[in-house]
């Protein structure tokens, strides 16, 4: 018997199962397929040829063997393996079809994109080039990146390991997986009950037959009954082990789903304000470690040429000169009155200085007065010269 086709299918199921499902698959291949193909064929090859009855009545021996074994043990176990593996094979076909469809849809979406770019952050250099202060600008801005480069980076990063349950859920195969698991469990229970009613737990060394055309009750003898009994008990144990693995896998899926839901709720409670504000990729932000400072209006992020920068600088200088020229033309009309008030304040200050010096040095009033007079004259001449030039600066 060739098992290569079924074995290849079951190996493909190994890639779309949980770790409990992988254990079940190992038990199915090693203990069921190998034991049935190797041990069963060698043990039960002579079950009918060595079935001997103590009668010479034609046809009596065949009728008695049919009563002893309505279905051959090996054929029963082969039929059991095929039916138990059928739900898994159907699940595999559905999974391959759905995954291929999803990949095809993703490929179409990527091909339909007119601008296959992704966002990444880069330091803004346009403003720095115009300032010419040789200082780094901490502000960061998004830059477009090719989607292929992003995919290469994602492929280079190792994927987190898991037991297969999350992969099944992400692919949308959880319902089909649970359905095939239930069908597999039902088949296991059905074949376990059928094996008990057909063969029991022991292969007896002889069998009493009274069917027609046997003239009376006759005794029939079975070859190697002890060996066949041991093999029968082994197959009972393998069936029970597969049934326990199915139950364990269902519990694993149930508790794993509950644990994931509880963890997601706990993360939401721990970080309630994670999504309370709108997020946009176009908003500039500073990297960690930089102090936020108010900056002038940002120049639009473009690679400005030297000609454009020079043109903008000349335009700004011209506007500044025009602004300062207009300020000089709009001097106040009462400039002379302001100068008179300044001279009067200067005279009062001189008188106060003379009085103070007269009190402290009464012997030299003339010398002080002469010095003060010369100083006042020089100040007046300076003020008159400044007013004549039309400047607003006044020397005191």
Curated annotation (Swiss-Prot):
One of its GO terms (molecular function) is gap junction channel activity involved in AV node cell-bundle of His cell electrical coupling. GO terms for biological process: atrial cardiac muscle cell action potential; AV node cell to bundle of His cell communication by electrical coupling; cardiac muscle tissue development; cell development; cell-cell junction assembly; cell-cell signaling; chemical synaptic transmission; gap junction assembly. Its main location: membrane. InterPro entries: Connexin (IPR000500), Connexin45 (IPR002265), Connexin_CCC (IPR019570), Connexin_CS (IPR017990), Connexin_N (IPR013092), Connexin_N_sf (IPR038359). Residues 376-387 have a biased composition (Polar residues). The chain crosses the membrane at residues 23-45, 76-95, 176-198, 229-248. It is a multi-pass membrane protein. Keywords: Cell junction, Cell membrane, Gap junction, Membrane, Transmembrane, Transmembrane helix. The keyword Membrane applies. Residues 147-156 have a biased composition (Basic and acidic residues). Residues 145-165, 353-396 are annotated as: Disordered. Residues 46-75, 199-228 are extracellular. One of its GO terms (cellular component) is synapse. It comes from the Eukaryota. One gap junction consists of a cluster of closely packed pairs of transmembrane channels, the connexons, through which materials of low MW diffuse from one cell to a neighboring cell. A connexon is composed of a hexamer of connexins. Interacts with CNST. Belongs to the connexin family. Gamma-type subfamily. This is Gap junction gamma-1 protein.
